[in-house]
């Protein structure tokens, strides 16, 4: 059961208040990793025999603490730009055009991703508005970034008088590359996980490293104590999504030479990513909910996206087959 199902309850409000306190807790206690005064491991994939004794979430350079969350997202952006520019060059387009777009897209996508997250988790920020600007503890929603990026591309292509769908077809290859890498920022932040599981990929996390608002009643019931240290055992949904997105990217790289119309890669991205997000989001304990409901906003948005993308692809391909039959 998700602890946020009853968003009007006193328990829900109390848990949401803990999130703001948790950010301060991270600032005070996680300076490149917790010092718990114990030899217990921070994290392990118990059924794979993989143990991480100490999981840092940042590094310090010249006195400045840099979160791995931000580093990984930055690396994902660079890798995404490289993939998009490479595909643009293959198609005879000017890669510099994509670099110019990226300067705007990165800024507005980060703003959009943060705004989306804050809007649907407003109770965690309304009493401490400055925390809205603290990105080191996480809190970027990919759909907010995608929406902002799409709007930016619409404006950019209109100004440059070029095809929106033509740029989008190469752009989504870079986008999903960034998503593949970016999810590992969630790993270092010990977030974006699901409920209790005993499957092959089950991940066990030291409970004290986790934001209390992300720990569902189910996880509390299945709490594991080893050598006096409490752990939760979860679905590593960040890993599921990263691997799923890798599969979508590989398919798109294979299919791109076979595409039938401009914009097809964009719709394939929406369909492929949406299908994965529908089921993965259902596993997560930190879902952003539509106010007044128990519905996960990203899961609902994914379902709508799948229906629209699937319909567009079906109609366009049927039209192309009919046209080919008529010409024959």
Which residues does each predicted region cover?
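Terminal transmembrane helix and immediately flanking juxtamembrane interfaces
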Residues: 5-6, 17
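Basic polycationic patches enriched in arginine
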Residues: 13-19
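A feature for loop-to-transmembrane-helix boundaries and adjacent hydrophobic helices
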Residues: 25-328
């Amino acid at each position: 059961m998700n602890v946020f199902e009853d968003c009007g309850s006193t328990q829900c409000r109390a848990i949401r208040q803990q999130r703001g306190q948790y950010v301060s807790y991270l600032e005070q206690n996680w300076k490149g990793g917790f010092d718990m005064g114990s030899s217990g491991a921070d994290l392990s994939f118990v059924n794979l025999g993989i143990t991480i004794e100490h999981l840092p979430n940042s590094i310090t350079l010249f006195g400045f603490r840099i979160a791995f969350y931000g580093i990984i997202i930055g690396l994902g952006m660079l890798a995404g730009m490289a993939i998009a520019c490479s595909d643009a060059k293959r198609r005879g387009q000017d890669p510099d055009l994509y670099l110019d777009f990226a300067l705007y897209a990165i800024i507005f996508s980060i703003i959009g991703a943060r705004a989306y997250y804050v809007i649907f988790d407003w109770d965690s920020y309304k009493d401490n508005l400055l925390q809205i600007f603290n990105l080191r503890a996480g809190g970027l929603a990919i759909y907010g970034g995608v929406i902002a990026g799409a709007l930016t591309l619409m404006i950019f292509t209109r100004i440059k008088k070029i095809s929106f769908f033509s740029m989008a077809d190469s752009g989504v290859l870079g986008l999903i590359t960034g998503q593949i890498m970016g999810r590992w920022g969630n790993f270092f932040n010990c977030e974006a996980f699901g409920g209790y599981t005993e499957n092959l990929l089950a991940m066990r996390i030291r409970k004290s490293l986790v934001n209390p608002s992300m720990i569902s009643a189910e996880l509390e019931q299945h709490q594991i104590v080893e050598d006096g240290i409490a752990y939760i055992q979860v679905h590593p949904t960040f890993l599921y999504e990263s691997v799923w997105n890798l599969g979508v990217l590989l398919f798109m790289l294979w299919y791109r030479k076979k595409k039938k119309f401009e914009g097809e890669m964009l719709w394939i991205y929406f369909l492929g990513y949406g299908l994965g997000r529908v089921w993965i989001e259902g596993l997560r304990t930190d879902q952003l909910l539509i106010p007044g409901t128990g519905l996960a906003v990203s899961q609902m948005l994914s379902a709508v996206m799948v229906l629209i993308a699937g319909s567009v692809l079906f109609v366009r391909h049927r039209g192309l087959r009919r046209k080919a039959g008529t010409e024959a």
